[in-house]
Amino acid sequence: MDICLPIRDIYVRKILDSGGSPAVEAEVLAGEDIVGTASVAGQKGEQEIEAGIEQMHSQIAEELIGKNLFEQEEIDHLLEKRKEIPQEVSLAVSIATARAAAGKLKLSLYRYLGGTHALKLPALLILAADGTAEETEMDFRELMLVPKGISSVQGQIRAAGEIDSLFREALKKRNGREGEPDRKKQDAADGGVLKLLEKAVEEAGYQCGKEIFFAVNAGAGRLYEKQSGVYRFPAESRRCGQRVERSREELIEYLTRLTGEYPISLLEDPLYREDREGIQELEKKLEDREDCEKKTVLGRRSVMIDPGEIYTLTELSERVREVTEQGKGIILCRQRKETEDAALVDAAVAFGIGQMKLGSPGCLEAAVKYNRLLKLEEKLGKSLGTDCP
């Protein structure tokens, strides 16, 4: 870019994310009145973040001040070389730089990053149940809604909100039941949370398997016990009143059965990651089914990109290009703890990311992302990205 505007100053501060943990906010200043701001949820502990902020102020900022604000790749590559600073500090400065440049040109962030090629919104995977939440009482890490039968972001968000409300009520009723050991055992053995979610979809007036599908992050790595070679299911064990363990073969059968009973279009982390033989066996079982075109084990046709592993916007762009050249789809992961910054929504549009995971619409920080998507839909029209799963 021919325009030259030197970076005047960089300031980074510690803030709080949605979980009350330390996060990072960065400001990049240029010219007399240009300021770009960005915040990134914390991945590191408080001491590491504070040390990273101090290092940015005392060392790295000096290397960046005076650089042309519009040379995003040069700035990002300099940040990427300094791997000793926390990822959240680096990414916050990278995004703040882009925001400042976009502001100077009076462009939206997605348009500045993606130019005229930024035309499609990412299709959504919307959090329905978090395995770490006490009310959910499940062993899977996440259950998500995939509203790929609904053609607009506005419609997808509306559906998710309606389903979420009914699903929360159903969970409260289930958890409030007493003296029903047989029912509890049945709920656990038959994928009770999935059953409740399916019922909530239907009560909200949507069709499972046509408008709404499910994505399952089994989180098998945390269930796997290396020493014994089995998968332990503590939540199911509590509901059944007896220890529940599954071998590789039993877990494959369990997952295969669930994908037959429920409209599951995506399986993430279904088995211990190093068990390639088991994953291939699961893929084969899904391929042998008549509805195999609806099923995918993550990594076969789509790749998850975790923002917590990305240091700069340039790194994200390059990663997207690499995956796309392999002929695979991309899902931009959500962070479990968030800030009120929707920059990654703009980045997803700019770089042509097909799908994006987002938190529950009832979460304030996630709502900021949904509201940004709604505004972008007004500008770009109802043009959704590729449905990876």
Name each region found by the language model.
Residues M1-V24:
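Short, Gly/Pro- and small/polar-rich lid/capping loops
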Residues L107-L125:
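Glycine/threonine-rich beta-strand-loop-alpha-helix active-site module
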Residues I60, V93-A101, L105, F167, ...:
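Buried hydrophobic packing segments
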